[in-house]
């Protein structure tokens, strides 16, 4: 995009501009960190050990076919640590070495097996001309040999992990240029490392095809802008970011190992896939792309290479039951549409012999690959159909989650077990998709908030000590769900009860140790950790996504700003501000009306103030990477009109730091 020289800076009083800068940069402010009760992770209880032993008896955990597939074609493995520019560790390739042994009592043996499979890190030959780099990030980077270079499929999460993967491939396969780049879908772990694969300048100079599904850029740049802070905080639970990598902590994430939170960016695609079947040749290789939107991701594609009898199922297909609604939060996914895409995939793969995806390991052989697709089709359709049947029979989401059980033909199949998604929360997702939050019982239409309800429960039972005593009885019996319910009331109703926090941490720990879903294990163990040590000092930093945010439409930022307005504080305010992005030829008028922040294109002559700045500076301030000094001395920022009103306006925007307490209040 052409850059326009901003007008000469109009000097203003340093004190007023300082106040403006401080208001605009308030995202840097952090909220207080509640203290925990201290303590360390414990061992498995006898009940948990017995539960995990039962899993060993009920599943053929010694099945070796998956291990043979996961290790097939091995070329080389990276060692050591992947470091960021500041020296911090982004990925430790040796961190999961503890998985080499048998499952301990502190791990569900089925999850342990899956975690062992995902621990096969390195460069692998899938077939002639097709290679995968696994374990450099949570997703796979796939290389397909074209006539002149590599066709790269998915670019991982960060510039650092993608660059490391490409360098490793260069080392072992020989250096080749990138001749095309394919983004299978608009989740950041598949495109965020694009700038580590190839630069924007090289794409433009060599006219390198960048292929993506229709709607990709809109989804890629806006997915987490609106509720990114809250979703990011919850993702720390889902992915177990702060847990130790050990038999007492993080084993896996279900789809792979760690998400590499380095520098994230994106390249705008120059070829979009709109059709259900769209042929295209890339660097001499004939592809058939399939547009499959609004299932696993709002913008997604799969593809076949007929000459190689190869099919890539993107993230619609994997070696786990996926999420219909991830516990970090998202819009509910359409289970029926997902099942229908799997049915179409069966037709598309009648002649396929090699099946790969955006996560996990390949499958060789048509019958086995089609079995995986059919099992996934039927897991999602069974979950959908049985949930709908029970909705129509009058059951509530929590009841249905207890009632729906997969038939043995599905539940005994490792490739569709709940390591990332979970049947119980997927059932609730189907309910939410059709019925929303309300279960139909008027008692649940306007219940008390959790803290107020907890206080009244404690009054009823005679205080937190009585609740803890009852919970201890449940804990000793291995009735952890009931113990957690009692103790959650005790912790919320009486924050001073150290015994409640201590026992709840122990309870969550046992629930985590028994969980087959890696995401559930991570959530329980993170809850236990935060009860002991408090919330983290740092959330998921916006600064890491600065290159991605540069490409986000300004309207998305303004929508998020409006959703951050402190409504009660704005109730009697009548302010109007012009925002002019001097390098983009974009102007917006922002105004308050009925405690709502509105905006539209253009400027208003009666605005109280006009803020002129470049979009990069605007984005840096939102991301928290532009310091006050940078702002004050920048020629990229000017203020016209009332600086006091400008400060008042931005002072009404909430400053969410993303480290709020989750298991306490």
Task: Show the residue positions of the predicted features.
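Divalent metal-coordination and catalytic microenvironments
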Residues: 129, 144, 154, 169, ...
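Feature captures hydrophobic
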Residues: 33, 38-39, 479-485, 492, ...
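Accessory terminal helices/loops
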Residues: 36-112, 228-259, 347-354, 361-555
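Bacterial N-terminal signal peptides that target proteins for export
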Residues: 2-20
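Active-site HxH/HxHxD metal-binding segment of metal-dependent hydrolases
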Residues: 60, 64, 69-72, 161, ...
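Metallo-beta-lactamase
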Residues: 149-150, 157-159, 261, 265-270, ...
């Amino acid at each position: 995009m052409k850059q326009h020289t901003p007008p000469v800076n109009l000097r203003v009083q340093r004190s007023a501009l300082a106040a403006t800068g401080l208001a605009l940069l308030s995202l840097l402010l952090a909220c207080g960190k509640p203290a925990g009760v201290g303590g360390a992770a414990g061992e498995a209880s006898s009940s948990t050990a017995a539960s995990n032993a039962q899993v060993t008896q009920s599943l053929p955990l010694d099945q070796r076919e998956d291990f043979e597939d996961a290790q097939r074609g091995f070329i080389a493995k990276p060692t050591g640590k992947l470091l960021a520019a500041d020296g911090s560790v982004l990925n430790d390739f040796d961190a999961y070495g503890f998985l080499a042994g048998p499952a301990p009592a502190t791990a569900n043996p089925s999850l342990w097996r899956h975690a062992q499979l995902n621990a096969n890190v390195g460069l692998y030959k899938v077939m002639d001309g097709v290679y995968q780099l696994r374990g450099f990030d949570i997703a796979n980077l796939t290389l397909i040999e074209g006539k002149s270079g590599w066709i790269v499929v998915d670019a991982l999460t960060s510039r650092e992990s993608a660059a490391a993967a490409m360098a490793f491939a260069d080392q072992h396969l020989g250096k080749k240029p990138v001749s095309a780049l394919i983004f299978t879908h608009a989740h950041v772990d598949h495109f965020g490392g694009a700038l580590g694969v190839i630069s924007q300048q090289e794409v433009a100079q060599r006219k390198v095809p960048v292929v993506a599904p229709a709607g990709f850029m809109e989804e890629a740049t806006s997915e987490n802008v609106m509720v990114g802070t809250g979703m990011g905080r919850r993702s720390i639970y889902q992915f177990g970011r702060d847990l130790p990598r050990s038999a007492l902590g993080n084993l896996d994430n279900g789809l792979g190992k760690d998400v590499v939170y380095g520098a994230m960016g994106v390249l705008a695609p120059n070829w979009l896939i709109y059709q259900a079947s769209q042929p295209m040749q890339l660097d001499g290789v004939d592809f058939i792309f399939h547009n499959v939107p609004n299932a696993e991701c709002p913008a997604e594609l799969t593809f076949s290479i007929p000459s190689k009898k190869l099919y890539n199922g993107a993230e619609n297909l994997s070696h786990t039951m996926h999420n219909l609604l991830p516990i970090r939060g998202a819009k509910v996914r359409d289970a029926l549409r997902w099942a229908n895409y799997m049915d179409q995939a069966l037709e598309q793969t009648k002649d396929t012999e090699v099946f790969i995806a955006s996560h996990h390991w390949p499958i060789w052989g048509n019958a086995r690959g089609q079995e995986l697709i059919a099992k996934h089709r039927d897991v999602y359709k069974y979950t959908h159909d049985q949930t709908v049947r029970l909705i129509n029979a009058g059951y509530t989401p929590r009841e249905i989650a207890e009632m729906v059980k997969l038939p043995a033909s599905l539940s005994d199949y490792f490739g569709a077990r709940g390591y990332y998604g979970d049947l119980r929360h997927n059932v609730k997702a189907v309910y939410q998709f059709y019925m929303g939050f309300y279960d139909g019982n008027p008692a649940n239409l306007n219940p008390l908030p959790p803290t107020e309800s907890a206080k009244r429960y404690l009054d009823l039972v005679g205080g937190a000590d009585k609740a803890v005593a009852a919970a201890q009885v449940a804990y000793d019996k291995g009735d952890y769900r009931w113990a957690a319910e009692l103790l959650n009331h005790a912790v919320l109703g009486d924050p001073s009860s150290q015994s409640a926090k201590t026992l709840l941490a122990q309870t969550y720990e046992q629930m985590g140790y028994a969980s087959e879903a890696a995401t559930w294990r991570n959530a329980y163990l993170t809850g236990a950790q935060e009860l002991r040590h408090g919330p983290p000092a740092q959330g998921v930093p916006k600064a890491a996504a600065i290159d991605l945010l540069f490409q986000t439409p300004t309207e998305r930022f303004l929508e998020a700003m409006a959703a951050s307005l402190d409504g009660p504080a704005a109730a009697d305010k009548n302010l109007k501000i012009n925002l002019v992005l001097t390098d983009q030829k974009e102007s917006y008028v922002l105004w308050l009306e009925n405690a709502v922040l509105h905006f539209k294109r253009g400027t208003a002559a009666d605005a109280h103030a006009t803020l002129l700045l470049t979009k990069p500076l605007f984005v840096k301030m939102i991301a928290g990477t532009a310091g006050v000094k940078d702002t004050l001395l920048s020629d990229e920022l000017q203020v016209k009109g009332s600086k006091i009103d400008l400060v008042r306006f931005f002072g009404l925007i909430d400053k969410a730091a993303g480290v709020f307490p989750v298991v306490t209040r």
